[in-house]
Amino acid sequence: MINITIIDTGCANLSSVKFAFDRLGYNTEITFDLNKIKSADKLILPGVGTANAAMYNLQERQLIETIQNLTQPVLGICLGMQLMTEFSEEGNVPTLNLISGKTNRIPDTGLPLPQMGWNRVQFVKNCPLFDGIVQNSHFYFVHSYAVSPNEHSVAISNYGVNFSAAIAKENFYGVQFHPERSGKNGALLLKNFVEKVPF
């Protein structure tokens, strides 16, 4: 059985992510134990809250270097994806620097912030996360900050401006939306992470 570990960042709604995997029949463990994280087959980096609070908690739990050195697949969700970039404008804090790019506040285009609700996602590169999911499917977003499209974007969305809905580099994958709140498409994405992303 695949060992799936949810990294306890100390500021995330971990239970909803765990329940999403439970519904799919996968066993997961929530932990910040370094040895368990290092030995996991697949890892989830969730996040709700602010980038500076999350980075502070990761530093306090001595997780930053551990995460940076992981070689197994890691899926960052929402703030977890933003933490994978180099820097976040939210609190002006250096982040994990796993994937190039910066997280900036969504520009004021007259739309309310945070973006909260369903939005269309366009796949721009082949990625196993989206295997079997129809192009321009809808996923559920809650965010005021985003990563501009770059060479590591595998999907984009638009909320006044285009932004990265998903990024990937080597073993690190990130999604700006909440798959655990995105119905069948989100469930399939989580299943794809477990079953289609190689490790």
UniProtKB/Swiss-Prot annotation:
Alphabetized GO MF terms: glutaminase activity; imidazoleglycerol-phosphate synthase activity; lyase activity
Pfam families, A to Z: GATase
Pathway field: Amino-acid biosynthesis; L-histidine biosynthesis; L-histidine from 5-phospho-alpha-D-ribose 1-diphosphate: step 5/9
Disulphide connectivity of cysteines: none
Primary localization: cytoplasm
Active-site residues, as the UniProt record annotates them: 78, 178, 180
The EC number(s) this enzyme carries: 4.3.2.10, 3.5.1.2
A single GO BP: L-histidine biosynthetic process
Every Glutamine amidotransferase type-1 domain range: 3-199
UniProt xrefs under Gene3D superfamilies: 3.40.50.880
Reactions that this protein is recorded to catalyse: 5-[(5-phospho-1-deoxy-D-ribulos-1-ylimino)methylamino]-1-(5-phospho-beta-D-ribosyl)imidazole-4-carboxamide + L-glutamine = D-erythro-1-(imidazol-4-yl)glycerol 3-phosphate + 5-amino-1-(5-phospho-beta-D-ribosyl)imidazole-4-carboxamide + L-glutamate + H(+); L-glutamine + H2O = L-glutamate + NH4(+)
Cellular compartment(s): Cytoplasm
Keywords, comma-separated and alphabetical: Amino-acid biosynthesis, Cytoplasm, Glutamine amidotransferase, Histidine biosynthesis, Hydrolase, Lyase
GO cellular component: cytoplasm
PROSITE patterns: GATASE_TYPE_1
Record note on quaternary structure: Heterodimer of HisH and HisF.
Biological role: IGPS catalyzes the conversion of PRFAR and glutamine to IGP, AICAR and glutamate. The HisH subunit catalyzes the hydrolysis of glutamine to glutamate and ammonia as part of the synthesis of IGP and AICAR. The resulting ammonia molecule is channeled to the active site of HisF.
HAMAP family the UniProt entry points to: HisH
Protein name: Imidazole glycerol phosphate synthase subunit HisH
Organism listed in the record: Haemophilus influenzae (strain ATCC 51907 / DSM 11121 / KW20 / Rd)
